[in-house]
UniProtKB/Swiss-Prot annotation:
Single Gene Ontology MF annotation: alpha,alpha-trehalose-phosphate synthase (UDP-forming) activity
Gene that produces this protein: otsA
Protein's name according to its UniProt entry: Trehalose-6-phosphate synthase
Function (record text): Probably involved in the osmoprotection via the biosynthesis of trehalose. Catalyzes the transfer of glucose from UDP-alpha-D-glucose (UDP-Glc) to D-glucose 6-phosphate (Glc-6-P) to form trehalose-6-phosphate. Acts with retention of the anomeric configuration of the UDP-sugar donor.
Taxonomic placement: Bacteria, Pseudomonadati, Pseudomonadota, Gammaproteobacteria, Enterobacterales
Annotated D-glucose 6-phosphate binding sites: 10, 77, 131, 301
PANTHER family tied to this protein: BCDNA.GH08860 (PTHR10788:SF106), TREHALOSE-6-PHOSPHATE SYNTHASE (PTHR10788)
Protein species of origin: Escherichia coli O9:H4 (strain HS)
EC annotation from Swiss-Prot or TrEMBL: 2.4.1.15
Length: 474
């Protein structure tokens, strides 16, 4: 049976208990255990790139990691992946900081990784690449003669041509992506956006609905919405509360809780969320003294100015809103710029009456799914969800809102706070059914199954396809 080789920017430590804290790690480990294989990625450390790979083997899985130099890490990861691709793919061209040296570093590191992986590959390996850090990776492997089946999954949104084509190197990136055999996206909108970008640049031949050829390269596109571990989350949420949390729950017995947890990131719509909550307090005064909104937003990329600006903005808005609407004995908004243990968050989800998840743009947003999975089915909370989160395509029984419309979000919060138990139970049951069916294992099994169905490339077939392909006419 073919081995599975997984490549990601970072690898989870070879400690199953630690890895289980993150959904992606669970899915990847499940796939690796089923097939046996290798997880290859950056160690998280800077140092001499020429050092031998660090290898750890447990059972039928090998972890192989490498160091990056300070320059390579800065150019590949900070300056290009996170200062160009991340904002552009989240529709924030105003925050893109394109620099040629960073682009060169991005390509250089992808080539370096291909060189390091090449000696580890076997002829029948199936290779699965993850996320925007590694868009050119298949191209680098093909240049080195690798004809194995290579799949790619994009965890973040794929932008429309108007956005993507603004990147100075968009044409190169698109052609490199076509070196993958299978391109997986979170939503159908993302898949179609990619094909639109491609069609604007070159002639694309579509043999069936999701099988295409461009630049003589045959590839398939498909949608694989990533899932979670609902049973594990329900187990964590239902366990006994720590003493401090139990005390807080008792103190807030007659207060309805609106809860959000997100990384401090401009894509998450946190300032817009605060302002929508202010509209709720202004237009629905009957809730004064009876609700509390808690926003947990741990610092992410704190050395980047755009992230510093959001943190200062949230601090100012929280103080202003509390100063305007707060009363003796009642603080309407709690903003915590801190990290909390994942298991504790699941318990907080369970006793929260409303889960507020309103990103401006998000590939999926697993927090929304985790909130649903953490609820008590007999007395569940209500999910208020942005239409621009990938999860909105599946969780259609949530209260779907436009995060840019403060009045709509405020009205949804009022509806959630006053919703009947029967409606809450019905909506929750519908969403939980979707989450259980499309869990993290279903996600990885579908992707790997589809990748296995693809006939491996050969040098002869690639050359034959090139002869039969013509450039797009002007």
């Amino acid at each position: 049976m073919s081995r599975l080789v997984v490549v990601s920017n970072r690898i989870a430590p070879p400690d199953e208990h630690a890895a289980s804290a993150g959904g992606l790690a669970v899915g990847i480990l499940g796939a690796l255990k089923a097939a046996g294989g290798l997880w290859f990625g950056w160690s998280g450390e800077t140092g001499n790139e020429d050092q031998p790979l660090k290898k750890v083997k447990k059972g039928n899985i090998t972890w192989a990691s490498f160091n990056l130099s300070e320059q390579d890490l800065d150019e590949y990861y900070n300056q290009f992946s996170n200062a160009v691709l991340w904002p552009a793919f989240h529709y924030r061209l105003d925050l893109v900081q394109f620099q040629r040296p960073a682009w060169d570093g991005y390509l250089r590191v992808n080539a370096l990784l291909a060189d390091k992986l090449l000696p580890l590959l076997q002829d029948d390996d199936i290779i699965w690449i993850h996320d925007y850090h590694l868009l050119p990776f298949a191209h680098e492997l093909r240049k080195r003669g690798v004809n194995n089946r290579i799949g790619f999954f994009l965890h973040i949104p794929f932008p429309t041509p108007e956005i993507f084509n603004a990147l100075p190197t968009y044409d190169t990136l698109l052609e490199q992506l076509c070196d993958y055999d299978l391109l997986g996206f979170q939503t159908e909108n993302d898949r179609l956006a990619f094909l639109d970008c491609l069609s604007n640049l070159t002639r694309v031949t579509t043999r069936s609905a999701k099988s295409h050829t461009a630049w003589g390269k045959a590839f398939r596109t498909e949608v694989y919405p990533i899932g979670i571990e609902p049973k594990e989350i329900a187990k964590q949420a239902a366990g006994p509360l720590p003493p401090k949390l139990a005390q807080l729950k008792a103190e807030l017995k007659n207060v309805q809780n609106i809860f959000s947890v997100e990384r401090l990131d401009y894509s998450k719509g946190l300032p817009e969320r605060f302002l929508a909550y202010e509209v709720l307090l202004e237009k629905y005064p009957q809730h004064h003294g009876k609700i509390r909104y808690t926003q947990i937003a741990p610092t992410s990329r704190g050395d980047v100015q755009a992230y510093q600006d959001i943190r200062h903005q949230l601090e100012n808005e929280a103080g202003r809103i509390n100063g305007k609407y707060g009363q003796l004995g009642w603080t309407p908004l709690y903003y915590l710029n801190q990290h909390f243990d994942r298991k504790l968050l699941m318990k907080i989800f369970r006793y929260s009456d409303v889960g507020l998840v309103t990103p401006l743009r998000d590939g999926m947003n697993l927090v929304a799914k985790e909130y649903v999975a953490a609820q008590d089915p007999a007395n569940p909370g209500v999910l208020v969800l942005s239409q621009f989160a990938g999860a909105a395509n599946e969780l259609t029984s949530a209260l779907i809102v436009n995060p840019y419309d403060r009045d709509e979000v405020a009205a949804a919060l009022d509806r959630a706070l006053t919703m009947s138990l029967a409606e809450r139970i019905s909506r929750h049951a519908e969403m939980l059914d979707v989450i259980v069916k499309n869990d993290i294992n279903h996600w990885q099994e579908c992707f790997i199954s589809d990748l296995k169905q693809i006939v491996p490339r050969s040098a002869e077939s690639q050359q034959r396809d090139k002869v039969a392909t013509f450039p797009k006419l002007a």
